[in-house]
Amino acid sequence: MRYLTAGESHGPRLTAIIEGVPAGLPLTAEDINGDLKRRQGGYGRGGRMKIESDKVEITSGVRHGKTTGAPITLHVINKDHQKWLDIMAVEDIEDRLKTKRKITHPRPGHADLVGGMKYRFDDLRNSLERSSARETTMRVAVGAVAKRILAELDIEIANHVVVFGGKEIDVPENLTVAQIKELAQQSEISVVNQEREQEIKDYIDQIKKEGDTIGGVVETVVGGVPVGLGSYVQWDTKLDAKIAQAVVSINAFKGVEFGLGFKDGYLRGSQVMDEILWNEEDGYTRRTNNLGGFEGGMTNGQPIVVRGVMKPIPTLYKPLMSVDIETHEPYKATVERSDPTALPAAGVVMESVVATVVANEILDKFSSDNLEELKEAVAHHRDYVKNF
């Protein structure tokens, strides 16, 4: 399964094309719209979310509520585009109109300046429009399709925020994926410890008043994953490496860890490795899950536990200093619409890209043209592993 996305932040629409989805998968627009709505939610979101109410249109690859095996095309309209018709026009326009909302003051931490250098733009809006987090709308849409595949195979996925701007959220032990999903989706800030809810909201309000932004850490958990996804035979076949690349590809994400992650560097091997157990009902299990569900780049049957760190949003209402690319004079950076934090929304994006990578790996290992063959192949593999 592979996909491409296209579209600009203030262009007419966003598009994704997905190839390789098996035939026979039940899929409707509502399966996708629910996740698009979640992406637009979360405490601390700004004005753009009040303008856009994302709804997907499926224009190929689905007939009578089921996938056909053909490429699936998804579209989401940008309602805000009506205010940007001249600025984002495809055809050539008058020079005086081209300078409307022209950007020459690059924002520190954004793609503005380097994109302008790379592609030789004199208007940095060209960098801004495609590098905007608005692009993640389609990665969430693609991820929703991937999650439909996972659901048919009894694989669950959820996300929650574990750090807000340096404030760690205590997480109850031994929560199931279903419990994490339920608790996080009941929270406006996607945390499972609701005793911290108001404290974090007040903190977000304070940051907004100061014209600043905060980052944090999001955790995604995947349960019910078959043993043996990924491989140790080559560097680029390890599934944890593929997930890491997908997570760090999300706008503003700067790091990733699995299980105990960077804490491993402070511990001994006897404190980290997951002891192997066996029982007749479940087959092989682990006493702990310190490695986050991976051994040798392969899933080991334990839940995948992956965390991604998101830097503070670079667009500040009290902008940092920059330089005008035309005059080289110092200026305050350009201010575009922004939020004090987007961690709850970023969690939805992270969940989506992880789901896409896992679904793709399943389709790679259990290559099937249709859903029934896929389900049979996965069930047979699970039986084999249980009796190994």
UniProtKB/Swiss-Prot annotation:
Signal sequence region: none
UniProt EC number: 4.2.3.5
Cofactors demanded by this protein: FMNH2
MF term (GO), any: FMN binding
One GO BP annotation of this record: amino acid biosynthetic process
InterPro entries for this protein: Chorismate_synth, Chorismate_synth_AroC_sf, Chorismate_synthase_CS
Keyword Iron-sulfur part of the UniProt annotation: no
Keywords: Amino-acid biosynthesis, Aromatic amino acid biosynthesis, FAD, Flavoprotein, FMN, Lyase, NADP
Positions that bind FMN: 130-132, 251-252, 296, 311-315, 337
Cellular component aspect of the GO annotation: cytosol
UniProt remark on cofactor binding: Reduced FMN (FMNH(2)).
Coiled-coil parts of chain: none
Pathway: Metabolic intermediate biosynthesis; chorismate biosynthesis; chorismate from D-erythrose 4-phosphate and phosphoenolpyruvate: step 7/7
Reactions this protein catalyses: 5-O-(1-carboxyvinyl)-3-phosphoshikimate = chorismate + phosphate
Taxonomy, superkingdom: Bacteria
Subunit structure: Homotetramer.
Function field: This reaction introduces a second double bond into the aromatic ring system.
Record family assignment: Belongs to the chorismate synthase family.
Protein name as it appears in the record: Chorismate synthase
Source organism (scientific name): Streptococcus thermophilus (strain ATCC BAA-250 / LMG 18311)
Lineage summary: Bacteria, Bacillati, Bacillota, Bacilli, Lactobacillales
